[in-house]
Curated annotation (Swiss-Prot):
Similarity field: Belongs to the RRF family.
CDD domains: RRF (cd00520)
Described function: Responsible for the release of ribosomes from messenger RNA at the termination of protein biosynthesis. May increase the efficiency of translation by recycling ribosomes from one round of translation to another.
Location in or out of the cell: Cytoplasm
CC annotations in GO: cytosol
Protein name, entry field: Ribosome-recycling factor
Keyword S-adenosyl-L-methionine recorded: no
Keyword DNA damage among UniProt keywords: no
Amino acid sequence: MINDIQKTAEGKMQRSVEVLKENLAKVRTGRAHTGLLDQVEVEYWGSMVPVSQVANVTLLDARTIGVKPFEGNMAVKVEKAIRDSNLGLNPAAVGDLIRVPMPMLTEERRKDLIKVVRGEAEEGRVSIRNVRRDANDHIKKLLKDKEISEDEARRGEEAVQKLTDKYITEADKLLTAKEEDLMAI
């Protein structure tokens, strides 16, 4: 029973870290990466689809993303979708290739982004702690119902705490890496 609780808790904590990683990846640094356009959608045959489904998205250099639509007539729509995406990007079409240069971040904008990143990391840590609380509550319920001994309950809570420490450390490492990435010029 305790092992099931631990496995469930670990899976949920792992998912919390993955969500944090995804959220941190969405925060734009001065460096280009193709994942930046994952959330941008463009109209194609009457429905909204991600840019990656109608175009080849590549890195041209460290500060420029290249977007080459599979169909030439989509270039204008893709360019407009990127411009209207609230990412602060200014794409420029060069023939059938759309160049998306990454604007330099100002010092003030970097500090604002660091606040956002720290908030995301704190949400991740809170999520991990909530999983710990739920697991410990489940263990206490089993103890109260006399399905496990006090020693088993204590060992279970200690194991859940170790998992919590492990995943909070992982979240902190992600935060530190993102902060360093943001402050690099």
